[in-house]
Amino acid sequence: MVVRRSFDAATLTRLRAMPLSVALEFLSVHAKTDTTYLPLKDKHSRRWHVKTLRGEFEILITGSKWYDTRAQIGGGGSIDLAMHLLGLSFVDAVTHLAANEGQHGPNHS
């Protein structure tokens, strides 16, 4: 018998709204912004150097969108970022983020 895992709408909405900079705290061993980065297209873009147990990444973040410059793949939101950086399924990414959020509180600004 297959057990179906589901999440309530409030949890998914909250995690999807989580700032990516906060998500990086939960997903990485080390993450820091590149203060020398000068965005070309959007002045709000930031480049992050991220280290996880799976390797090192160079991630551009603009609002809720992210782009991995080395893998040349992008996405949107913290759940998608968790799936990419940690190689997780959707269910595992949501579980990981929600567990870490619970340790640090749900409100991030």
What are these regions (language model features)?
Residues 1-109:
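N-terminal structured subdomain of primase-like DNA metabolism proteins
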